[in-house]
Regions:
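C-terminal subregions of glycosyltransferases and related glycan-biosynthesis enzymes
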Residues: 1-2, 149, 153, 186, ...
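Short, acidic, metal-binding catalytic loop of nucleotide-sugar glycosyltransferases
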Residues: 23-34
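A conserved acidic beta->alpha catalytic loop
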Residues: 39-50, 87
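Short aromatic/hydrophobic "clamp" motif used to bind/position activated sugar donors
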Residues: 83
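N-proximal low-complexity "stem/linker" segments adjacent to membrane-targeting elements
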Residues: 1-24
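Conserved nucleotide-sugar donor-binding catalytic segment
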Residues: 139-226
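Glycine-rich, basic loop-to-helix element that forms the pyrophosphate-binding segment
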Residues: 62-78, 88
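Flexible acidic/His/Gly-enriched loops in nucleotide-sugar-dependent glycosyltransferase catalytic domains
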Residues: 64-69, 98-173
Length: 330
């Protein structure tokens, strides 16, 4: 039986939204369990630190620069049966912890659960958010060993590998992979998904919108110069691919090849757009994305193939289109 849920909140330099994130956890409705808040940040702030102390939160200061390093510290410091992750600029729906606790309680052996999002504005606070009614659980359990190629395709197309604030994990398992998390700094959402849905794993997808995703300028990149946007995304994508490959090699006996290959293909499609590949190479990747869409589904692969076709004729135009259609990163 689940007795305690730990919420790991990480923050790097940014102070603006942190207390909103913490308050969204403190004001959970009928969680039915003890809640532990673990904040890992790289700054000292009297107001924030005083609030965290008065709230009984575990407040960890670190000089660690990487996201993975902070996440790993939070995992190691947690004492709950389940760990939920939360970025400092996001918030939880008031019923999230209660539903997640119930899901883990009713489905023994789960390692990983992913829930959906509700988009909120930059100005939204924990007490002004118009939350959706998510009391009835919309949840499905999967056994990784029983999934076909097409089923894996559908799962990844549902964005189950997207966004750390949507992820919850069995705490003992999270602690067992903490060192791998520590060594990663990009696409931690995909790393957690890849590890949590490994061989013989039981995992779940929850369609309830339990995470409030704050959409602001630093995320969308719409107000940045196209060249700057391309350069930043190019660096991010290259590092993400490197992280994904390193994780696969480090945990090769426990990772499923299919989701790894599917995620890698999607990243390579992104890279082909950002890196101004020659036409021949772009065409080969475009064909691979299209074949995947035809065989296994996933509208994002169809979209990437169309953008890559456009990229053959105009890299700048394809990047402009890519930037404007991204609500969630592809």
């Amino acid at each position: 039986m689940i007795e305690k849920v730990s919420v790991v909140i990480t923050a790097h330099n940014r102070k603006k939204y942190l207390l909103e994130a913490v308050n969204s956890v403190l004001h959970q409705v009928n969680p039915g369990v003890e809640i532990e808040i673990v904040v890992v940040k790289n700054f000292v702030d009297d107001k924030i630190d005083s609030f965290l102390m008065n709230s009984g939160a575990v407040n960890i200061y670190t000089d660690e620069e990487s996201f993975g390093g902070k996440l790993s510290l939070g995992i190691d410091a947690s004492s709950g049966n389940i760990i939920c992750f939360l970025d400092d600029d996001d918030m939880f729906n008031p019923v999230k912890i209660g539903l997640i606790r119930m899901i883990f309680d009713e489905n023994k052996g789960l390692l990983f659960v992913h829930n959906d999002i509700q988009i909120i504005s930059e100005e939204t606070t924990w007490n002004t958010a118009r939350t959706t009614n998510e009391e009835a659980s919309k949840f499905k359990v999967y056994s990784s060993e029983k999934l076909s190629r097409r089923e894996w395709g559908k799962i990844l197309s549902s964005r189950a590998d997207w966004y750390v604030s949507c992820a919850s994990m069995d705490a003992p398992f999270a602690k067992s992979i903490s060192q791998i998390v520590y060594q990663s700094n990009r696409s931690l959402d995909k790393i957690l998904f890849l590890l949590g849905t490994g061989k013989e794993a039981s995992f779940g997808l929850c369609k309830n919108r339990l995470t409030m995703y704050r959409k602001h300028e630093s995320i969308t990149g719409l107000k940045t110069d196209v060249t700057d946007f391309r350069n930043r995304r190019l660096k991010f994508t290259k590092e993400s691919i490197e992280n994904l490959r390193r994780t696969f090699k480090s945990y090769i006996k426990g990772v499923n090849n299919l989701p790894y290959n599917y995620m890698l293909l999607k990243m390579e499609g992104n890279l082909a757009i950002y890196d101004k590949y020659r036409r021949g190479k772009t065409f080969r990747i475009m064909t691979a994305e299209l074949k995947h869409f035809i065989r296994y589904g996933g509208e994002e692969y169809a979209l990437l193939s169309m953008l890559l076709f456009l990229n053959i004729f105009s890299n700048r135009l394809s990047i402009r289109v890519f930037r404007y259609i991204q609500i969630r990163d592809i």
